[in-house]
């Protein structure tokens, strides 16, 4: 899980989710997991 100020989709399988005001990226490639913080 990368924690970044700016989260962007890395590949076309990445999906942007917003849970409780936290922006997350989930992807089938585990290296692409990110959250904003």
From Swiss-Prot:
UniProt-listed SUPFAM superfamilies: Ribosomal protein L36
Sections of the chain in a coiled coil: none
Alphabetized InterPro entries for the sequence: Ribosomal_bL36, Ribosomal_bL36_sp
Protein family: Belongs to the bacterial ribosomal protein bL36 family.
Origin superkingdom: Bacteria
Gene Ontology terms: biological process: translation
GO (cellular component) term, any one: ribonucleoprotein complex
Pfam families hit by this protein: Ribosomal_L36 (PF00444)
PANTHER family per UniProt: 50S RIBOSOMAL PROTEIN L36, CHLOROPLASTIC (PTHR42888), LARGE RIBOSOMAL SUBUNIT PROTEIN BL36C (PTHR42888:SF1)
The protein, known as: Large ribosomal subunit protein bL36
PROSITE patterns found in the cross-reference section: RIBOSOMAL_L36
GO MF: structural constituent of ribosome
Organism field: Methylococcus capsulatus (strain ATCC 33009 / NCIMB 11132 / Bath)
Assigned keywords, A-Z: Ribonucleoprotein, Ribosomal protein
């Amino acid at each position: 899980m990368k924690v970044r100020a700016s989260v962007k989709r890395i590949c076309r399988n990445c999906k942007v989710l917003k849970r409780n005001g936290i922006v997350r990226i989930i992807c089938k490639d585990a290296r692409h997991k990110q959250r904003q913080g």
